[in-house]
């Protein structure tokens, strides 16, 4: 099976690559159209700000390509947020919302934590919707590792939720696009199982 990690220019790819290799796969890191289209499974990791990430995707001419992918794609952390429509996380002085990949019509918003510190960093519990294959064999309220200050609110595509001040989407799914706000590659056995589930879909 051909597993490709999209080289977005805005992610630490080594930890994701290592986690996939530990599961017995040989992932390829690429931004080439032919390689991406030939993949059986794709991963879209991301760190940093939404506006910087979209700038990188635009420079690499990946935006139209990602939107038309038909194979399963897993967005990780910022990679999940990029599937939304807009983000409040802007680099510009005007503070305008950033247009994202618009795979789903949901915003990314700064977390309302009711006094809890940002970023939301560390281990927190994830409650998946019953029966979703991405969480097969993973206990309800399993702990995963988070680092973020922005989140997607609960919506039609939410398949798991987490509470930090407010409840937010910790995993989403729409058609062939899946996303997790946490870092499965840094989440021990539960994270490894989630990656395994995705790769075996």
Curated annotation (Swiss-Prot):
Alphabetical list of Gene3D superfamilies matching this protein: 3.40.50.880
Active site annotation, chain numbering: 77, 183, 185
GO molecular function terms noted in the UniProt entry: glutaminase activity; imidazoleglycerol-phosphate synthase activity; lyase activity
Pfam families (alphabetical): GATase
Listed PROSITE patterns: GATASE_TYPE_1
Domain Glutamine amidotransferase type-1: 2-201
Subcellular location: Cytoplasm
GO terms, biological process: L-histidine biosynthetic process
EC number annotated for this UniProt entry: 4.3.2.10, 3.5.1.2
InterPro entries referenced in this protein's UniProt entry, alphabetically: Class_I_gatase-like, GATASE, Imidazole-glycPsynth_HisH
Job description of the protein: IGPS catalyzes the conversion of PRFAR and glutamine to IGP, AICAR and glutamate. The HisH subunit catalyzes the hydrolysis of glutamine to glutamate and ammonia as part of the synthesis of IGP and AICAR. The resulting ammonia molecule is channeled to the active site of HisF.
PANTHER family reported in the protein's UniProt record: IMIDAZOLE GLYCEROL PHOSPHATE SYNTHASE SUBUNIT HISH
Name of the featured protein: Imidazole glycerol phosphate synthase subunit HisH
Protein species of origin: Photorhabdus laumondii subsp. laumondii (strain DSM 15139 / CIP 105565 / TT01) (Photorhabdus luminescens subsp. laumondii)
Classification lineage: Bacteria, Pseudomonadati, Pseudomonadota, Gammaproteobacteria, Enterobacterales
Gene: hisH
